[in-house]
Amino acid sequence: MSVKEHLIHNVHKEEHGHAHNKITVVGVGAVGMACAISILMKDLADELALVDVVEDKLRGEMLDLQHGSLFLRTPKIVSGKDYSVTANSKLVIITAGARQQEGESRLNLVQRNVNIFKFIIPNVVKHSPDCKLLVVSNPVDILTYVAWKISGFPKHRVIGSGCNLDSARFRYLMGERLGIHPLSCHGWIVGEHGDSSVPVWSGVNVAGVSLKALHPELGTDADKEHWKEVHKEVVDSAYEVIKLKGYTSWAIGLSVADLAETVMKNLRRVHPISTMVKGMYGIKDDVFLSVPCVLGYHGITDVVMMTLKSEEEEKIRKSADTLWGIQKELQF
C-alpha cells in the first residue's frame, strides 16, 4: 500500500466534474497577470485558466501562481496554449494583443489586434459557448465590437472594461484634492476609453452634495480651481505610467477584478463599462461605448440613462462617429 492509501480512507468516489466558477484569462502579459493575481486575491473562482501563445512564459506564470497555493483559496490553476483548458468558463477575460507603445494612440493598435482576435474568439466560443466575454485589450471599445461580431454572442454577454478604470482614476484624483477616500467621491466618466472620454460634471458629488451646485464653473474653462485638469490627468495618466515603467498593469488588473466580482457574485452593481449603445444618445451605428451598466451573472442587463448636457451628448456622438469610421474599414 502507498503512503496515500495508508493515510486516506476513501468514502466517496468523486467524479471529475467541471468547475462551477471558472475564470479564464487570455494573455499572460503584465495586464493579464495583474488581472489573474487580483482575481485570486479576491477568491472569485474555483478554477483559473491561463492561455497564451508563448508557452515557456505561460508555464512559468502558472507554476509561480501554483507555488503560492497555500496562500490562496483557488484550488485549481491550469494553463495551456490549447483552448481546451478554458472549457466551461463562466467568464473569459481577454487581455491578449499588441501592446500600446509610448506615444501611440489606442486607436492605432486596432488592426494588429483584430487579427489576434480572429484566432482567440472562435476558440473561446468553441469551449465555453455560454460564457461572458470581458474585453480588456486596447482599443477596448472597438475590440469589444470585434469580439461581439466574431463570437456571435448576444450583446449583453460581451463587455468591455471601458471607463471603469477612467472613472476610478477620476475618483482617486478627486479624493486627493478633497482629502476623502475615492469610495466617497462620486463621479462618472463615460464614452470612449481614452483620449475622448467624457466627464459628467453634473453628477460629481460627495455625500449627495453636487460640486457643480457649490461651484457652477466646475469643469469649465472659466473655473479658477481648474477642475478640468482632473479629467486631463485621467486622460494622460496611462501615457505617463507607460512613459515611466513601460506599461500599465496594477490599476487595470484591480479594475478588471472589480468587474469580475460583480459578474461572479451577481452583485448587480452599476459600472461605467463598454456596451452596445446604438439607439442611445442619438447614436445610429453598431458601436460600443461606456455608459453606466447594471452588471451581474448574465452580463449587462440594464443601462442607467444619464441626464447629459447637449455638449456631453455631442462629444459621445463624435466618439461614436470616430469609432464607426475605423470599424467600417476593419478586415474580419
Swiss-Prot record:
Chief location: cytoplasm
Signal peptide: none
Enzyme class: oxidoreductase
Protein keywords: Cytoplasm, NAD, Oxidoreductase
Domain of life of the native organism: Eukaryota
Family assignment from sequence similarity: Belongs to the LDH/MDH superfamily. LDH family.
Pfam families given in the database record: Ldh_1_C (PF02866), Ldh_1_N (PF00056)
Pathways per UniProt: Fermentation; pyruvate fermentation to lactate; (S)-lactate from pyruvate: step 1/1
Positions annotated to bind NAD(+): 29-57, 99, 138
Active site: H193
Gene: LDHA
Binding site for substrate: R106, N138, R169, T248
Quaternary context: Homotetramer.
Species of origin: Caiman crocodilus apaporiensis
HAMAP family with a match to the protein in the record: Lactate_dehydrog (MF_00488)
A GO biological process held by the record: lactate metabolic process
Protein's UniProt name: L-lactate dehydrogenase A chain
